[in-house]
Amino acid sequence: MPHYLARSTRPDDPIEPGGKIIIAGHGRFGGIINRMLSSAGHATTVIDYSSEHLEALRTFGFQVHFGDATRPDLLQAAGIAEARLLVIAINDKAKITELVRYALHTYPDLHVLARAIDRDHVYELWAAGCRDIVRETYDSSIRAGRSALQALGLNPRQATRIADEFERLDRASMPVLANLYRLDTPPHLNAPYVAKV
């Protein structure tokens, strides 16, 4: 049994679709996305499995629902068939990939934005058909790298130029490497992948 299901025997909340956007997971990643979308006037339907976390969010006026967002019946109740966007922000690599596969297979016109736990996970999600993938620590790492360059004596403009160029090259290489990545082969044993890294 997944660890999060053992936390509570509470039944799933009944869901009345609140918008054309479903956010699966409302932790430190999904919560920021939901706040940003809400501040721009977008109604969302949020599904999370942390009962205590959701009760706290309700006190701040967020529309949240308890349940396992990877369950097809719960997604259907949330209105996935009419949704414009599914944001997958849960913190479980295997569950994210599973949900991406299900959503894109069942709803091929749905835009899926998926959280990637690490670089290898980006490739798994790419292989599953997702094309809008966000590495959870990527942007903060770029900012930290820029700060490190400044701490080493580069002026802010030079540090920004280096960080921007690194990001441009890294983003350009991602689809190329994703197409060479093999789920059944460790990256260091995949000669075509290694040749491009």
Residue ranges and their predicted role:
Residues M1-V197:
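Cytosolic regulatory regions of ion transport systems
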